[in-house]
């Protein structure tokens, strides 16, 4: 992995590239041969477990784009920065990428907390972020393309499925103590109660905390039909191990999580989380031709033991969606790329075709997967059609921070 601030160059300049003056009128880092973009994730700290795959996926996409001739005939160069699992650091590094490196776009962030810190920088510097993580919704910015699912595509869809298919009536909500889990659980609670079901407990642990004994004890005492867990980063390892140590077996106790993908399972260990359900657009096990090619390319670049989760897949989408928007706009200028983005379709996405909505989120399918001991998921449900994104669903708008 590259160190912060370094740039990686991959040859692939196509002939006949349009003149730089015609495709760059705003002073971003574009020459006749290259254009620079930023990658901004946590390579260190508690979030490195979750964000490492995003870095790898973005680098793979950029390499593939360069090998196919680049963007508007220019190869993509990367300026990488480490957010270090610290939200103000994310803001500072985003400012550097935009003000000093003058990148045309940033691919990055993972937590809602880091995204919220970066948003004012994007607005001040007129930047564009491709954000890969499923999140709570309740936000829409012209400076962000959200490649992950929002609440209606994940939280509500997952709850509706477990109520319908498992007959769930009572829920215990648990999460890491920051914006995304708290906002997501507020949405979940309202939806659960609107459906005539009950929340029998709600608890949080600090991000990075490894002491879950008291929370696990309260879960056992409450005896919920469903544990609804949004524990994030390295805390996942401790949480699931302590559930098992307390005798909570996920082949008997229903657990639905929005925060565990194949990436996190690699750190947790399949024996501790097998049986859990998660709602996502992507699973590595999807039997689609585009996904088989994606998995093969990812493993060829990063090793045969590499795994790919939903957010890693969403990160891979970012550079491709940016390329399509740049080529539609005929320009690297951020305002033109933003204007060109709605309606962009990515027919070759590993999870299946998707497109950008006017609200900067994605039309996409939703799937339910059940964790296996080998670190993969069995897909037990998927929607037939693409689900329209709605970051401000009826009855939830007032929850927006």
Where are the regions that the model predicts?
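Extracellular/periplasmic periplasmic-binding protein-like sensory domains
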Residues: 243-316, 327-332, 383-400
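Solvent-exposed, acidic/polar segments of extracytosolic/periplasmic ligand-binding ectodomains
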Residues: 13-18, 35, 345-401
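Immediate post-signal peptide segment of exported/extracytoplasmic ligand-binding proteins
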Residues: 16-39, 70-75, 163-169
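Signal peptide-proximal N-terminal region
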Residues: 30-32, 37, 56-78, 194-196
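Beta-alpha junction/loop-to-helix N-cap segments that form part of ligand/metal-binding clefts
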Residues: 23-25, 49-56, 69-138, 205-212, ...
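N-terminal export signals
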Residues: 1-20
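Extracytoplasmic ligand/sensor domains, especially the bilobed periplasmic-binding protein
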Residues: 103-203, 253-277
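Extracytoplasmic "Venus flytrap"
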Residues: 22-57, 81-88, 110, 175-182, ...
């Amino acid at each position: 992995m590259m160190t912060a601030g370094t740039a990686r160059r991959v040859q692939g300049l196509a002939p006949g590239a349009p003149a730089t003056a015609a495709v760059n009128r705003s002073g971003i880092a574009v020459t006749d041969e290259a254009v620079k973009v930023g990658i901004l994730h946590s390579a260190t700290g508690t979030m490195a477990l979750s964000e490492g795959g995003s870095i790898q996926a973005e680098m793979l996409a950029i390499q593939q784009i360069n090998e196919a001739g680049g963007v508007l005939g220019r190869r993509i160069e990367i300026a990488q920065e480490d957010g270090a699992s610290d939200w103000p650091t994310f803001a500072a590094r985003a400012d550097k990428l935009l003000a000093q490196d003058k990148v045309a776009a940033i691919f990055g962030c993972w937590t809602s907390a880091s995204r919220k810190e970066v948003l004012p920088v994007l607005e001040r510097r007129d930047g564009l972020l491709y954000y890969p993580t499923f999140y709570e919704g309740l936000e829409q910015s012209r400076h962000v393309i959200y490649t992950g699912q929002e609440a209606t595509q994940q939280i509500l869809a997952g709850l509706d499925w477990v109520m319908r298919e498992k007959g769930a009536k009572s829920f215990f909500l648990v999460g890491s103590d920051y914006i995304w889990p708290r906002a997501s659980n507020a949405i979940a609670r309202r939806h659960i109660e609107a459906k005539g079901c009950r929340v029998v407990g709600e608890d949080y642990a600090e991000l990075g905390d490894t002491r879950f004994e008291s929370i696990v004890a309260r879960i056992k005492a409450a005896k919920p039909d469903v544990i609804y867990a949004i524990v994030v980063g390295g805390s996942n390892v401790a949480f699931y191990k302590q559930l098992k140590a307390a005798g909570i077996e996920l082949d008997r106790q229903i657990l639905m999580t929005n925060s565990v993908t194949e990436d996190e399972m690699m750190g947790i260990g399949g024996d501790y989380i097998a049986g859990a359900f998660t709602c996502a657009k992507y699973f590595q096990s999807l039997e689609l031709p585009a996904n088989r090619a994606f998995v093969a390319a990812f493993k060829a670049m990063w090793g045969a033991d590499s795994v790919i989760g939903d957010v890693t897949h969403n990160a891979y989408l970012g550079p491709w969606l940016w390329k399509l928007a740049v080529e539609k706009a005929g320009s690297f200028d951020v305002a033109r790329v933003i204007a060109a983005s709605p309606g962009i379709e990515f027919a070759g996405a590993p999870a299946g075709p998707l497109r950008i909505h006017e609200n900067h989120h994605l039309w996409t399918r939703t799937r339910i997967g059940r964790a296996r001991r080998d670190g993969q998921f069995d897909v037990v449900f998927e929607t037939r059609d693409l689900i329209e994104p709605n970051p401000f669903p009826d009855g939830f708008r007032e929850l927006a921070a």
